[in-house]
Amino acid sequence: MTDRVEINGLKIARELHDFAMNEVLPGTGVDAETFWHSLSQIVHTLSPRNRALLSKRDDLQAKIDAWHRANRAPSDLQAYEAFLREIGYLLPEGPDFKVTTSDVDPEISQIAGPQLVVPVMNARYALNAANARWGSLYDALYGTDAIPETAGAERGKGFNPQRGEKVIAWARKFLDESIPLRNASWADAARLSVKDGKLAVDFDGAAADLADPAQFTGYSGEADSPREVVLARNGLHVRIIIDRNHPIGSTDRAGIADVVMEAALTTIMDCEDSVAAVDAEDKVLAYRNWLGLMKGDLEETFQKGGTTVTRKLNQDIRLTAPDGSPIKLPGRSLMLVRNVGHLMTNPAILDRDGKEVPEGIMDAMFTALIALHDIGPNGRRMNSRAGSMYVVKPKMHGPEEVAFAVELFGSVEDALGMRPNTIKMGIMDEERRTTVNLKECIRAASERVVFINTGFLDRTGDEIHTSMEAGPMIRKGDMKQSTWIAAYENWNVDIGLLCGLSGRAQIGKGMWAMPDLMAAMLDQKIAHPKAGANTAWVPSPTAATLHATHYHQVDVKAVQEGLKSRTRAKLGDILSIPVAVRPNWSPEDIRQELDNNAQGILGYVVRWIDQGVGCSKVPDINNVGLMEDRATLRISSQHIANWLHHGVVTPEQVMETMKRMAEVVDSQNAGDPDYEPIAPNFEDSIAFQAACDLVFKGREQPNGYTEPVLHARRLQKKAQDRKGAAADSSRG
């Protein structure tokens, strides 16, 4: 039984209450009585409306299901569009407008660059991400497949000089392209110095300067013998580290020991899809790490290579400007926080009727209270120098739900004494009803919006669930080539530019999900800035370092200017449904699809349920590591549910596949000492039961979301573990 403290009609888990009282409130300028009174008022005012919005989702889905049962996949798109307008799914588009968001940090409003998303419950990951503002290009190239392991350039255990030479050559070529010298190459540089406020590069007696002297930002150390020189292109900095005593610098003609990229400009500290937070214990862990990030004192100590390492937040970088004045560059990524959406409740707080409080309301109040340690009256201003708090709000369906979030944020600001519109909003364009009404969604948050982002993973899950009754969907791997997805990606950019986001907000693109395949990422992910996105998601600090090179190659502001005049993507294309009109899959095709989906589901769910790990690199059926979170789970589970519903596969076939793939997942996790095998005790495995629920009850899940099943089963597993621990203790 959870120990609770009752205040103003709220029954708060003692763990959360004590955390707020002892750790969060001191230093914010907000007194405890005001905080709890305001939280109660917000909960009891807004919770009924939150529930009404969820009921509207269900009502619209029921009408769409009935329409598809009568019509199947629409051959008459005009009739389908008219139906969606009639039921209020597709809303009238209002006149053109421009967003008016103000007090936005340049990392969001002005500079294009990579964005990390990291589970805030993992302090080490969170610190690594925050510190990924800067990343070693040498390390990123040497340690990944970005440099081929051919012609003697294998990674191996020790340092390979041949591989090192290829890394240095790659980096010098990058410098030649990004920050060119006048009539010279960085490959031939012998010495760097600063003379008369300009960078001078010597070449054994000859000298060259930058083709564009304005690219020189500053240096540290002595002008005649700097420790580093800092250059810039498209607003992104590059630090050339000079150290002739360093193992690399000592062998380099110019003494260059490293090239350090400005990499993850922004990081989303995630309380949502990449975490498993089901109760007060979990929420306190998430909030405590967010608190440490906002106060600047988060630390994590761990063992690495037999030594104890303590990780903390990096300090700002102090430099001398070309004119001799002191300047600072931020040492950390600008942090946003992703709250949960409108769907879930959490037992951490109960309302006066004993109902669990909507988790999105709880997140808004607690993450904002914590942010006061950065932007409040006594705040450090070490995250947002502009004095704003950035909240990414996921999984909203249409402008009415965005307006509800805007009202929630306003209520939180009033409660905490924040100026109006201090809390900025990132809108995830990952639900179909938001996509088709995107302009009106942005209008609803026009004073707060700092971010729109296509999340094609969740968006595909919603696509499948919305049109579940239309027919069997095409194979999952074919989705990226479907008509709707290309239109969706372009539509997001088109609408964002139309609404004036350029120069004020981010227009983002989705995740590169293969953290080990960096050569492929370097080749392909440049498509995101070329498409007009001024940020895109990457799975690791290393990936951020490499993806940053794309923003040197592409001037996103110029791309956006060019795109403003193109013809807008077509609504009809977005509304086209990816059903297989005449499926002709062979039994082998079906088996492969089923195996792939089932293995992905089990590989992710078993860690979520048994270990509380919400985001991890899960080997796929071909043992390629993929970053999995609830979005990928939503697609896979909905896809099997769809094929089951339309008779492409049978329940027996699916169950046989799930059991067979459980053995594959067990073998893939054989090296994990904390792993609990699924097979052969399928009935006893809560994780296996959760995976089966997601598939066999997939049509019943609200909008195809996985959270209700995952939360219920994780709570069951935690209770089982506590019971087992108590039994062990009594025996001991």
UniProtKB/Swiss-Prot annotation:
CDD domains: malate_synt_G. Its main location: cytoplasm. Mg(2+) binds at residues 430, 458. The keyword Transferase applies. The active site is at residues 338, 629. Residues 702-732 are annotated as: Disordered. Residues 718-732 have a biased composition (Basic and acidic residues). Its cofactor is Mg(2+). It comes from the Bacteria. One of its GO terms (biological process) is glyoxylate cycle. GO terms for molecular function: magnesium ion binding; malate synthase activity. GO terms for cellular component: cytosol. Acetyl-CoA binds at residues 117, 124-125, 274, 311, 539. Its EC number is 2.3.3.9. The modification Cysteine sulfenic acid (-SOH) is found at residue 615. Monomer. Belongs to the malate synthase family. GlcB subfamily. Involved in the glycolate utilization. Catalyzes the condensation and subsequent hydrolysis of acetyl-coenzyme A (acetyl-CoA) and glyoxylate to form malate and CoA. This is Malate synthase G. It comes from Chelativorans sp. (strain BNC1).
